[in-house]
Curated annotation (Swiss-Prot):
Keyword field: Chaperone, GTP-binding, Hydrolase, Metal-binding, Nucleotide-binding, Zinc
Designated gene of the protein: ZNG1
UniProt key word Ion transport: no
MF term (GO), any: metal ion binding
Protein's UniProt name: Zinc-regulated GTPase metalloprotein activator 1
Reactions the enzyme catalyzes: GTP + H2O = GDP + phosphate + H(+)
Length: 429
């Protein structure tokens, strides 16, 4: 239709421009009696040829429908040996009804997939797609960049419905998530759908509890921050948690209970799936839209864990508070005096402490933010807040009357619920 919109009248091809008949003319019968038809085409052959040519040229010059379609990206993270590559195989190589592209950013001896699919391309920072022959594509990236992935998508029009990005086992997924999480105005051809964290049920507690490098079973050089390991950050950023190798602990109900409690202390909002060989229905993992909307149930049913095990290094807290009175209170108080200081450079902690830093040096850092904010007024509205570390965005929400309180869930390190609640209380006084 966009091509036809630009078709113009040509008197030589189309003949005399006809008069418009509305049916309300006083001499309508006289007009109809003078209507003649020569038996030819209503639209001239020249006109048909010109329209067809213009449509062809427009189609050739315009961006392809497949290129315009935004492609979702799921980031798969977890330590080497946790089952990431097995999960990729389950999703991409065994019966998925999507045309999936797999991007590998980890080179490990245990991954036969990587050995089979990695191809070289000179000194380029990214490598070409490899067609696997079953509707899926694969490539390996050493220097991940959104532009590199967008270029690959553009060179494969119509071949990609979904992208799976496997990170290095020792990678913090937050910077990668922020890289993909772009403003709609940037018109990127890809967007982040969610982060899937794969855990090894048998070893994850050891990874979380023992921060010595020698204690880590996977053999990687573990990135440490204070007394936090990358496993803490991978869990905190997860939108879906795959508890893999469940068969190694299912014989011990106590171990299963302890594992659930520990994971929930760190991240209480991501759905958790216990698996063997990373086998779980695809609909549990793909097209979850974790970064562009929040299901109300995710917020209402989430909060800090209530188990007997507490990990004060990384955890989840939930704040509930009254609806905001108006847009002014939302913008000038909640956003500028609470949310932004909370997320930016630990100003929140310093504000609560009268402008000084904590004596123990353990200033909090929010890893993930999800919130539902209700704003009263003549026409009540709701806002959904999504955040990754110091970056956040706001989306329209639904104010259906069933929700009576604002709720915000924070996942991060060294979070002090009492201090953050105090900051919020002072802000909204």
């Amino acid at each position: 239709m966009s091509a036809l919109r630009n078709i113009k009248f040509n008197e030589e091809e189309d003949g005399e421009l006809p008069c418009l008949v509305t049916g309300e003319e006083n001499n309508l019968q006289e007009i109809l009696e003078n209507v003649s038809y020569d038996g030819g085409n209503i639209v001239s052959d020249a006109k048909v040829e010109r329209v067809n040519k213009q449509v062809e040229n427009t189609s050739a010059g315009a961006t392809d429908v497949h290129e315009k379609k935004r492609i979702p990206v799921s980031i798969i993270t977890g330590y080497l040996g946790s089952g990431k590559s097995t999960l990729l195989e389950k999703i991409a190589l065994k019966g998925a009804d999507k045309k999936i592209a797999v991007i590998l950013n980890e080179f490990g001896d245990s991954s036969e997939i990587e050995k089979a699919m990695t191809i070289k391309n000179g000194s380029n920072s990214y490598q070409e797609w490899l067609d696997l022959g079953n509707g899926c594509l694969c490539c390996s990236l050493k220097n991940i960049g959104v532009k590199a992935i967008e270029d690959m998508v553009e060179r494969s029009p119509g071949k990609i419905d979904y992208i799976l990005l496997e990170t290095s086992g020792i990678a913090d997924p937050a910077p990668i998530a922020k890289m993909f999480w772009q403003d709609e105005g940037l018109n990127s051809s890809v967007y982040i759908d969610g982060i899937i964290t794969v855990l090894d049920c048998e070893h994850i507690l050891k990874c979380l509890d023992d921060i010595s490098i020698d204690a880590h079973w996977h053999g990687d050089k573990v990135g440490l921050e204070g007394n936090l390991t990358i496993a803490h950050f991978q869990l905190a950023m997860a939108d879906r948690i795959i508890m893999n190798k469940y068969d190694t602990i299912e014989h011990s109900p106590e171990m299963v209970k302890q594992l659930k409690e520990r994971v929930r202390e760190i991240n209480s909002i991501a759905p958790m799936f216990f698996t063997k060989y990373s086998d779980t229905p695809i609909q549990n993992l793909l097209d979850i839209h974790a970064y562009d909307s929040v299901r109300i149930s995710d917020i209402l049913d989430s909060g800090s864990g209530n188990g007997t095990i507490h990990d004060d290094r990384m955890g989840t807290i939930m704040l509930t508070f009254r609806p905001l009175k108006n847009e002014e209170e939302y913008n000038n108080k909640f956003i500028k005096q609470f949310l932004q200081p909370l997320l930016w450079k630990n100003f929140g902690a310093m504000t609560v402490l009268g402008g000084r830093r904590r004596d123990d040096g353990r200033d909090w850092e929010v890893q993930r933010t999800k919130g539902l904010i209700l704003i009263e007024g003549e026409n009540p509205i709701a806002r959904v807040i999504q955040g990754v570390r110091d970056t956040y965005d706001v989306f329209p929400g639904k104010y259906d009357g069933s929700n009576k309180e604002c709720k915000i869930v924070l996942i991060g390190k060294y979070l002090e619920k009492e201090s953050i609640e105090e900051l919020l209380r002072k802000t909204l006084e």
